Regions:
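Mid-to-C-terminal functional-domain signal that highlights helix-capping/loop sites
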Residues: 1-202
Length: 202
């Protein structure tokens, strides 16, 4: 079943129907209730395995349904990052982030950092505040072991990972930024559900 060109799901306990884009119950006993969003990062298996070497993987199976078989992200055209702050959403289109991979932003009263990795073709989002201090981030010359550029904060010169939000060297080494709720999404799908939401670059 589709709603605004997006899949609907149902729960087995109440048979309520849910919209996966917004996490809201669309119909049924739980109509109007919202699920809690969890941050979702799309990254390469190499990046993930290096960060979490003990990761276990469920065996896959080939599907004969119309969904087909996922063969990896080959393009970012039409994609963006949906960032949710205090129940409000903002879209950061990947096309705009290609031109400006590090964005120091403020949205819904919160200082936000959005970082796009050209190599990984994905983005992450973090709070820029740390222990009462507001940090401003820039692209660093240094790279991680996978060739991805690292970040540098302008206040202490510490070097940060775009993927984990952790300071890997400098005065703030070991510190970690608070991860925001975000997930990659088709730009058109975001606009269909969040018609009045702000869009970075517009």
């Amino acid at each position: 079943m589709l709603f605004k060109n997006s899949f609907l799901m149902y729960d087995h306990q109440t048979n309520s129907i849910w919209v996966h884009v917004t996490g809201e119950a669309f119909h049924g006993p739980l109509k109007g209730k919202k699920l809690k969003f969890m941050p979702s990062t799309v990254t390469t298996w190499e990046n993930w395995k290096a960060r979490y070497p003990q990761t276990l993987v469920l065996p896959g199976r080939r599907s004969e349904t119309f969904m087909g078989i996922y063969d990896g992200m080959t393009t970012t055209r039409g994609l963006g990052l949906s960032v949710v702050v205090r129940f409000k959403a903002k879209l950061y289109p990947f096309a705009a982030l290609l031109k400006r991979p590090v964005v120091n932003d403020r949205f819904n009263g919160v200082a936000v950092l959005v970082v796009y990795s050209i190599g990984a073709k994905t983005a992450t989002a973090w709070k820029r505040g740390l222990d009462g201090r507001l940090l401003t981030f820039y692209m660093a010359k240094a790279k991680d072991r996978f060739g991805n550029r690292l970040l540098r904060d302008g206040e202490t010169g510490s070097i940060w990972s775009w993927l984990t939000g952790e300071a890997v060297s400098g005065a703030l080494r070991g510190s970690r930024l608070e991860q925001l709720t975000y997930h990659p999404i088709l730009n058109d799908r975001f606009k269909a559900f969040y018609q009045r939401a702000p869009i970075f670059g517009d």
